[in-house]
Amino acid sequence: MNLNKYIKSHILSKLAKDKERKVGIEVECFVYTKNHKRLSVNSLNEYDATNLFKELEIAANGDDIGSFSLEPGGQIEWSSPPFSNLNDLNDSLQKYKYLLDQTLNKHDLINLYIGVDPFNSPESIDLINQEKYELMNASMEKNGTLGKWMMRNTSSVQLNYDIINERDACELAFIIDCLHPISAYLFSNSPYQLGQPVDNKNLRNYIWENTDNSRCKSLLDHGMVYPNTLLDDYVNYIKTVPLIFELDNNLNPKKTKYQTVGDQLSDKYISAELRKEDVEAALHQIFTNVRFKSLIEVRDIDCLPFKHILAPVAFFSGIVFDKKNREKMLDEFSKWDVNERKLWNKSSLTLDLNQDGPNGKSYYDWVIWASELSISGLRRRGLNEEIYFIKYLSSVIDNGPLTLQSQNLFLKSKESLQKFIFS
């Protein structure tokens, strides 16, 4: 087995049976004090985000509620258990919210489910005191313009789907990558920056596009064009990406002497010192809109208001879980011209459905096409899961994505932004 096969075998190490595929989600949110200040992550004298995380971790222990983690700017992330049924996932989501609200209320804290911090510059937000994130911060300073914004001031909803086999992995990643402009529009919820409305700028999407050209963006931007070779192409790609950190003998992140992921993994593979944890750490240093771990992860969704968090899960699940939809999308997307796809990806930075899309159709046409397919797939499952998407979709089609809806309501309110958001 060569190195590429070793990496690929790790990605394909937790295959599910076709009828047993599950989905899990990761939900990030910001936390503010009662005075509407971001909760610090490193306070020495006051209750901070680190204390909050530890309290949540203890409260969730043994309750099968999922797990909590702490993001670099103090955002709280919850990871659900995996489920095959979105109604069961919803039950888990409600348990998480109840536990989070109970804990926040004890300390007069407020959560905010939004894609980008509406008020603060990244310079005003402490970075968590962890080696991994300090190394990441240093890397972002050298390799992009908005990495500090990404680390400190963004929150998202991420989806993790089981892989069935290699062909499934290739085709799903290709389909999800092609869907990026659609999901980026439907699930945009970043209306404000530094206290000001952003107009029709798709802000969180824009921040990620300008974070690190080597490890972000779409798979298409890194030469992954064809579904049949996508996983092999992905393995070749990750080997070229600059390495942020490596793991020491105790599996803790440390500064690395290697230039790229491939340099480190090759060296350890040749010396028979390569561990599965080294491969896993390398895969987690890739931030494309869709990426492989031992799952397929969808990463291009803004954090949405709590009541809408399952909307993107339903949208993607109506496609991922439905063979008919996957075949139809694979057939359609395989016809698209690469340059058209690149132009459409750029169009997703602006919230305007009147723009042109691929194959002679408008942005609007493709949003409707994909959404209707998703709903039909959900209905074929017969679990009433379409309820999590249909009303949300109708609102977005009629009034624009939440980024635009929020700004319109704010301008009509005549209130200060703080009062509008927190009241």
Predicted ranges, named:
Residues 32-33, 81, 162-164, 301:
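Solvent-exposed residues in well-ordered beta-strands and their adjoining turns
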Residues 35, 164-166, 182, 304, ...:
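A very general structural signal that marks isolated residues within well-ordered alpha-helical segments
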Residues 221-246, 361-389:
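An exposure/low-complexity boundary signal
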Residues 30, 158-160, 297-299:
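Structured core elements
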Residues 1-147, 153, 171, 294, ...:
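Terminal catalytic/cofactor-binding subdomain
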Residues 254-340:
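Long, well-ordered mid-to-C-terminal structural blocks that present hydrophobic/aromatic surfaces
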